């Protein structure tokens, strides 16, 4: 099953990546410029799993005349900034709500060329083994961007840790918390 999932994701990445390259004509056997030089596609990605997926599909792209140049970023702001500045041809790391939020906040007009998987969220701790063990007043780290913060708060609500207002959606913030029985502190 893991191999099948990997192949599916690789195909998805390949499709999304090539969609940004334009359409080939029937006369073109590989992706090359007018002089026959292979096309270089510079893509920004976060390390896991996006960079790994791109490395997986890079040999297949090379067979089609596309040299994939991967630029790794360790935060979620720089890939979009680099793309908007023309330093990249594409990036691969975000879901559509994050892209829309980034465009709105930064006055950019970046567009999606294809859907990708959405990273799962979970609760992690080196000390606490279950939600019930969370101490009163404990600090819980949450993402610092609007869309992923909302996803994290919805996850916390689903585990009974907090209650959000009925109007809270994917862009929920700490202000949308209407019940916090154990007085948790949230740190973006």
Residue spans for each PLM region:
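Sec-dependent bacterial lipoprotein signal peptides
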Residues: 1-19
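Bacterial lipoprotein signal-peptidase II cleavage site
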Residues: 18-32, 38
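Short, well-ordered beta-strand elements
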Residues: 36-48, 66-72, 139-140
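Beta->alpha turn/N-cap motifs
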Residues: 48, 75-76, 86-100
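Short helix-initiation/N-cap motifs at beta->coil->alpha
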Residues: 71-81, 168-188
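Alpha-to-beta junction loops
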Residues: 84-94, 138, 161, 182-185
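Ligand-binding "clamshell"
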Residues: 101-113, 127-128
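A conserved helix-loop-strand patch within extracytoplasmic ligand-binding domains
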Residues: 113-162
